[in-house]
Amino acid sequence: LATRELHGALLEAMASLSERLRLVVTLYYAEDMKMQEIAGVLGVTVGRVSQLHTDALRRLREQLSLDGDYDERQLALLLGRDR
């Protein structure tokens, strides 16, 4: 997908996440917070933040795969962290 199309698909996929999962993704990628900081915000352990982050990314990937082909690197760049 082109970057603009991927961005739109990502926004749609983000809307399908629960508020908590959206918050984890937003804090991690948009606010560039560390998992330990997010744990403090949410009042949970770092391990739980890691689980939520993994779940959110899995759900985003699943949703995006329903929308068509996408490039993992392109997605990482769009989210703001090249992982």
Language-model features: where?
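Glycine-centered secondary-structure boundary/capping sites
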Residues: 9, 32, 65-68
